[in-house]
Amino acid sequence: YTTLFRSEYLYLDLNTCERCMGTDKVLEGVLDELSNAFKMAGYSLEYHKVKIETAEMANAYRFLSSPTIRVNGRDICNSVQENNCGCCGDIAGTQVDCRVFSYNGETYEVPPAEMIAEAIMRMAFRPKVSSCCSGGYVLPDNLKKFFDGKHQKCCESTCSCGCC
């Protein structure tokens, strides 16, 4: 029989944000490298990319910070660390903090492949526990600022979202 292994990549932008684009590229490379090993171990790999476009989507996905990588519903990071993301600030027209990744005593805006591979392997084969998405959720202030700023910027220009 085959066991399902689910990986999700949640992000704000893949056109402008260097963190999101870089993490996307590294994650896809890691999943490509690991896919044969998972197949050999009897795992079926399911991969989903989710662009979080609204505060409502962020709430539905219990999105804490961009970018986020989840394995079987659990964030690969034990905590959320952030710093100013100029790219997302440009999108929203206001200062926005996005995720940074700590690995082996260093901090990265784009996580190294080794960190992602190690986290995926550790989480894929650990016993099933309740997902990170249980319990209370409140939209983090950084995401509220991003979505509010993005909406305001859209409405000040030629509104393409149809909300104004």
What does each model-found stretch correspond to?
Residues 6-13:
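Short beta-strand segments enriched in small/hydrophobic residues
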Residues 16-22, 82-83:
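Short, flexible/disordered intra-domain loops and linkers
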Residues 20-36:
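Typically the conserved alpha-helix immediately C-terminal to a functionally engaged Cys/Sec
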